[in-house]
Amino acid sequence: MNSHSHQTVRAETSRRDFLARSAAAFSGTLLCGGIGRAGEPLGYRIELTTAREGFDRKTGKACWAQSRAGIIPPGVPGNPGDRPLCLITTQPLLLSGSDVYTCVHEMRSDDLGRTWTPPKRCPTLARRIVSDDVEVALCDFTPTWHAATGRLLGTGQTAWYLNNRLMPNRTRETGYSVRDPQTGEWSPWKTLELPDVPRFKSAGAGCTQRVDLANGEILLPVYFKPVKDRCYSATVLRCRFDGQELLYVEHGDELKHDVPRGFCEPSLTRFDDRFFLTIRNDVTGHVTSGPDGLHFEKPRPWTFDDGTDLGSYNTQQHWVTHSDGLYLVYTRRDVRYDHIFRHRAPLWIARVDPQRLCVIRSTERVIVPQRGTRLGNFGVAQVGPTETWVVTTEWMQPAGVERYGSANRIYVAKIHWNRPNRPA
């Protein structure tokens, strides 16, 4: 796998220049996102960039997958500069099987994603050998800044392998790791201790978006089930984090749906003092909201504002949250893309009506285009007041997807807002 960029080049502009550029970058097309509180239409411009690319099926046994950004703000330990330090975590996916992951890697950019270092292996986030034929990996990793402790905390889940294949009737734990601000190294990954009850024997935070509260507590969505059951349920954990250890305090409503595999990969956000949860399901994605991030209304299927089905199924959706507008990033059915596995490309973005809990069809746009393969495992990160990123990877399964132009690109879709995103 060849890096798209082999060196990180330090830009000469300052953080002030970055903010000015973001605010003035609207000579391109503005996409209407609703009327903000000050009466000015909220808009944004999409800048699609590539952090790395390159794939050769003849020699490649793996492709990069599960790429997500983590942002360390300026002027904090580990980033004394005047611009955000941007990271991408990603990990090799073996093409010989299904969801067979190895060690998490890290890429860095100190020039706001103009250039990136090649993926570097993080030994502390590697697989662990349990026995001669059993190994366990940390996967589905999402790094997110925890302001109260000044640490980048990554959360995900474990995957257990028997002879390098997913183990049947396996457990699933919520895994996490903390990046040391002085050394830049990730701590050896740990698992979150949950109540010792059967339904939490398979409980993970893979691919989920969390919310950090002002007091430093964390609302972490997970999905769970007894090991031998078929259907998952979703809930939100309230956790404490001291900069090193993540501790369970309580969990909220247990949301259930008896449709194949139930509710998976929930993602949480907060907008206008209310919490919103989007949830994966095999048949159709669901959405709900609640007052405190723990208790929710009955989830309902995602629809457009005209009442028709959104068509997002069997993969994750994530939130893009601006203080003046709530957006959803998702995949959905479209006859133009029947050649793509589970219609997991392109990635769409649209504004959400937070009262009606629906997607406003007229605001829908493609944020990452399709090139014949899936993009459905992705993440969202706020880079600064006027910039938000959506990061995803071209997943090089099944064989032959490259004939449509896919090349295992790690995309960074930069959303440039025309108005600053105010802190919650």
How should these model regions be labeled?
Residues 1-14:
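N-terminal secretory signal peptides
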Residues 4, 26-29, 77-78, 357:
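Short amphipathic alpha-helical segments with coiled-coil-like heptad repeat character
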Residues 7-9, 21, 34-36, 49, ...:
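N-terminal cationic amphipathic segment used for targeting or macromolecule association
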Residues 11-20, 26-39:
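N-terminal twin-arginine translocation
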Residues 39-63, 71-136, 145-203, 211-265, ...:
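Beta-rich carbohydrate-recognition and catalytic domains
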Residues 66-68, 140-142, 207-209, 265-267, ...:
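Conserved beta-strand position repeated once per blade in WD40 beta-propeller domains
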